[in-house]
Structure formats: C-alpha cells, structure tokens
Amino acid sequence: MGTDNYGNPHGCDESTAHEILGTALDGGINFVDTSDSYNEGRSESMIGNYLADSGRRDQVVLATKYRSAVGPGVNDLGASRYHIVRAVEESLRRLRTDRIDLLYCHSWDAETPIEETLRAVDDLTHQGKIVYAGASNFPTWVLAKGLWTSDVRNLYRFEAIQSVFNILQPGLGREMVPFAEKHDVAVIPYSPLASGMLTGQHGKSGKAVAGSKFDLRDDSKGGGLKSRYFNDATFTAVEKFTAIAAKHGQPTVRLALQWVSEFPGVTAPIFGARKVDHVKGVLEAWSESAPDEVMSEVRAVADEFEAQAPMAYPPNSGQAFGTLPTSSAAK
C-alpha cells in the first residue's frame, strides 16, 4: 500500500487515509510504504495515528525512507550518519512505533561514502530501531557496491530494492531484477499501473482526465507524469494493452499487476490510492489470475514497447547529490 497521497492537497485527508488503510488491511494487504518526505511528514503521521489507535501495528510490515530533503538546512537531507540518525528518530515519533520494519535510502547519495550509510544503518539495526534496510531508485552498480561493502565489512545489507517498474517503464527488468534475484534482494516495484496510465483513461488528445494525477499535478516545467507518459509510443502501447483486457474480459489492473509480479524476486508491488473505491478495485482485480494465454499477449505488447521506446532506469540516476560526467566530459 503506497501512501504518498496521504496529506497531499491533491490526495486525501486523514479520515480518508484511515479508511483506505482499514480497507486494505481487511482485504489482506500487509505492507505499508511511506517516506519522511511525503507531504512534510504528514503521511507518516497519518499512518502512525491509524496503526496506534486501531491496535493493528503488528499486522503490517511498515516501511519508510530517508534521504530526500525534509527542511532547508544542509543536513536536512542525504544519507550521512548525521542525517540518518535524526531522520529515523523523527520517523519513529511520527509513526508512533518502536521500530521501522524496512528502512530505505530513498535514492543514491553520491556525496556520502556508502560505507558510512551502511554503518549507520547497521548501528540502528543493532539498536532495534530498524529491522531491515533497503535501497530505492539505485542504479544496479550502486546496489552491487553496497552489497559488496556489507559483505567485506560484515554490516547489515540492503535486503530490498524499490524502483518504478511497469509495462511503460520496463527498464528495471533488464538488469536490476536478474541481479537482485541472483543476490537474494527483494524487488518491490512502485507505480505498477503507471500512475493510472494503464487503465486507458487518458486518450491521445493529450488532455488528462479531470481529477486524475495527470490533471492535478503541475507538469509545466517538465519531468512530471505528462512528460513521462504522454507520447505516441506510450499511447499506442496503452491502446493495445487495453484492447487485450477488453477482448478477454480482464481488468486492466489485474493484467498490469500480474505482469510485474511474474518477474522472479518481485515480492510486493506497491499501488497508491486516493479513494477507498480504488483499493476495493485493486483487491477485486487481484483476487484472481489471468490465464497464461492472455498474459502472453500482454508480454508481447510490453516487449514491443520496450524495443521501440526504451526508457532509462532509474530516472535521473546519478544526478541527485552529484552529477555523473557526460560522455564528452569523460573523454
């Protein structure tokens, strides 16, 4: 259960967030994902209030993240020991819990030695404040370096990798997924429905459906959902995908989630919801599996799209906290 909508002006308020969480847990979902940077900590606070007041804390695996900016100061972001320790204490307070089950580094910090990050995480694990560590939006080579560092320094390691992965952003499957399977790292994809693009609700006109993420989130400066998904290749792939769903009477949500889940090592695809009905729709779709002959058609569409319009993975890798040299600069 993804929770970046909680406390967002375009998302949901606390009452709705609690109703969403209750519906999700009642339906068998037991993984809740958040971040200290989601809506200035409001997401963590809403989750913490619900789990503490309902007495359901031990029914879920609770995951959160550090690294993104949570204030204006130079130490209010990053993967340094200084920031991680402070971030964990603040997350524990907002989440109203004594432990974080899975703590991610939200993205690679190129200006902090990865050993410093892992030693801080190792200490927090020994203190019982976190149970497992994970990485999010890391390039494969950085995850590999982290695993090697943990091995040679005898430190707790990254046990999970979370990144965007869906039919329209398939890059994770090229290298990271097989690498993670080989090294026993769980793969936790987010945005398996491509922010709703795979439902087919957005047409080639380029006009977003009113009230959708594409409509509500500002993309005037680029880099947002429209910049990512509103192009001819994507619309063509979505048309083919939704046609398969219609032909076989299968929900698009089921096919999109099943495509992601078929990859070895994928453990908990994350979807978000702003309304209770969104959760109910996913639970209903996920209650059954599509036949393999249907999924073979879906795989064909995904393979064709990747061959025609490959996308970089992960987005902006290496550009946060330091920029990788360009090809001309590297010569």
Identify the meaning behind each predicted range.
Residues 1-60:
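N-terminal binding-site loop/beta-alpha segment at the start of enzyme catalytic domains
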Residues 4, 26, 71-175:
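Glycine/proline-rich, positively charged
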Residues 28-30, 56-60, 97-101, 127-132, ...:
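Short, well-ordered coil/turn segments that N-cap beta-strands
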Residues 172-215, 251:
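Aromatic-lined glycan-binding groove of carbohydrate-active enzymes
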Residues 206-243, 247, 262-266, 276, ...:
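Terminal-tail/helix-coil boundary detector
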